[in-house]
Amino acid sequence: MSERIEIPAEKLHEEMLKLRQGKHMDFLRSLTGMDWGEEGLGVVYHLEDTNTRENIVVSTRTTNREKPELPSVSDIWKGAEFNEREVYDYYGIRFIGHPDMRRLFLRDDWVGYPLRKDYDESLNPLRMTNEEPVDTTQYIEVQHDGSVIEKRETIFDEDEYIINIGPQHPATHGVLRFRVSLEGEIIKKLDVHCGYIHRGIEKMCESLTYPQTLALTDRLDYLGAHQNRHALCMCIEQAMGVEVSERVQYIRTIMDELQRIDSHLLFFSCLCMDMGALTAFFYGFRDREKILDIFEATTGGRLIQNYNTIGGVQADIAPDFVQKVKEFIAYLRPMLKEYHEVFTGNVIAQERLKGVGVLSREDAISFGATGGTGRASGWACDVRKRHPYAMYGKVDFKEIVHTEGDCFARYMVRMEEILESMDIIEQLIDNIPEGNYQEKMKPIIRVPEGNYYAAVEGSRGEFGVYLESRGDKFPYRMKFRATGLPLVSAMETMCRNAKIADLIAIGGTVDYVVPDIDR
């Protein structure tokens, strides 16, 4: 169990700095906005010491619902900047000392704050017009006399040369927009615009029963749908004290690793296409089809499987599942060597990727950039090793870590992880025990009152679920720690002083999925 601390708002920044420096809580795992009704509006922080893996949960609140304000911690953890903007967007809490207090997902002309419990949906009818572009942001600071003042600051100066990459650009891999300030071909500033595919999934969860919420996780990172749902099921099961059978743990682990291979093959294909290597693009898609066939035979779905459920999985594995998985692994190993011959060793690929988009280990931790991006920067951040779940504590595998922090390191981490995923599957596939594939659950699932957090290692990093329950059949608050939001928050750091063409390579190797960012 994690240690839990409540800190008064006026002491928050001081105490958080002590936790960061004194207790080495250098990783901000999750930052969640909350509406506790009459008890006020607030934030829950999940912190971790990357050396000892000790976790602390911190909460703070303000009772001023008319003009809620809390100190910003974005100067302590860089990843807090986008997370605090999200909280402002959803709850209207303004963070004093935050450098860019704009909405993150919603339009600037949006009325109200949708995750507040007293939010009135009628205030925002469907708009049929574009929003007016705004090139300013607000900065809130405390004066020496204790008064709070607001400042308006311009994001880009009038004499800066600005171009838009996205939201309708093939290399952004979805509806994401980068506003880029250029000096010649050199990137001087990058402003990320999210929210084009925001669907209000966390708000929707509050009016759904727990089994109904499961389908929404598949609509986040759709290339890690099985892993996302695994995290949510695990969070609910742990909260209820439900132990799934060992057979289920084996199946979930194997399916998670097949999903990881599937995602990394797609990463390889898309990066090759971005770099102009069309032949290699087809190689990855050709081989990925074999995994989708395996998924379809057992789950009925290819891209989105709808397979995990509370207490187990929806159906037992297909009769030929074991055979097909073993055949696929035997097929893919020699194919990976071919990938490296076609693309990895190519001099153009190496020139485009090596030394480009460098992210230091310290910045990776500060931004919370987990997954292949963090491990390429020398940070051993794999949830399967840090906090083992399912069968990961009983299998032998190597955590792939590189230290260069550039595009080529991020590429190689993912390619080498395919081999590790195959090794994990081979240790399990012939030893799946007999047993139930689903535990018997009550018709109406009620999670005991309390706060819960569970995380898995998704294809792009830590995917976490924070759940607050009041003992009802609906979640009081369900927050998803998207793997992609910390990644895009680090994009400006990686792109600054790079060439505009390098933006494509950097975005491709970061490997974000836009619906996962926007939720």
Swiss-Prot record:
EC number(s) per entry: 7.1.1.-
Location of the protein in the cell: Cell inner membrane
A GO CC annotation given for this chain: plasma membrane
Keywords linked to the UniProt accession: Cell inner membrane, Cell membrane, Membrane, Multifunctional enzyme, NAD, Quinone, Translocase, Transport
Main localization (coarse): membrane
NCBIfam families in alphabetical order: PRK06075.1
PANTHER family per UniProt: NADH DEHYDROGENASE [UBIQUINONE] IRON-SULFUR PROTEIN 2, MITOCHONDRIAL, NADH-UBIQUINONE OXIDOREDUCTASE 49 KDA SUBUNIT
Assembly notes: NDH-1 is composed of 13 different subunits. Subunits NuoB, CD, E, F, and G constitute the peripheral sector of the complex.
The protein's name: NADH-quinone oxidoreductase subunit C/D
Organism whose genome encodes this protein: Phocaeicola vulgatus (strain ATCC 8482 / DSM 1447 / JCM 5826 / CCUG 4940 / NBRC 14291 / NCTC 11154) (Bacteroides vulgatus)
Lineage: Bacteria, Pseudomonadati, Bacteroidota, Bacteroidia, Bacteroidales
